[in-house]
Amino acid sequence: MAVTSWLEILRSAEKTALLQDGKRMVHYLFPDGKEMAEEYDEKTSELLVRKWRVKNALGALGQWQLEVGEPMPSGAGSLGSELIKESNANPIFMRKDTKTSFQWRIRNLPYPKDVYSVSVAQKERCVIVRTTNKKYYKKFSIPDLDRHQLPLEDSALSFAHANCTLIISYQKPKEVMAAESELQKELKKVKTAHSSDGDCKTQ
């Protein structure tokens, strides 16, 4: 039922779509005032970007919070500037999914693979990354599993290390893949404007 409820929330949102530079951009406006923006590769339907924006206590819109995708380049908000500034040495954390896995990349981690430990913390509903040399520690959640009210499984987790980058993968549960497939069908029904058409219209 959880999958259906999240899908119903997405279906009930006001959606606008725009096709530009080989990307399908979808904007969702939810009844509670929250906004979500997604970008998909037009050919593969692979999710490239997902970000959220909520109103603050005074009703003003806050900054976009990135959930999936590359950090913004310098000048596109304070978060992006900060990340670019620190990119020479500090680890950079980002999420970039594939069709079958949620995937996170942590750049600027030079230690060999056997130094890392990646595990699920069931009670906290998060993934924890540690190093045996105590040089790096990171805890992060998987919002998709929270939205679908699904458990986190250690067996779905794997990681690799190459070129000073730790790549963590979590195999998508079948419920999530089914929901993503249904969402793609839903998005095909949304009237899509092209970048030359001007503003896209809300469904």
From Swiss-Prot:
Q: Mind naming one GO cellular-component term on file for this protein?
A: extracellular region
Query: Taxonomically, which superkingdom?
Result: Eukaryota
An individual GO BP term: left/right pattern formation
Summarize the protein's role. May play a role in the formation or function of ciliated cells.
UniProt lists the family membership as follows:
Belongs to the DPCD family.
Tell me the protein's name: Protein DPCD
The species this protein belongs to is Rattus norvegicus (Rat)
Per UniProt, what is the name of the gene that codes for the protein in this document?
Dpcd
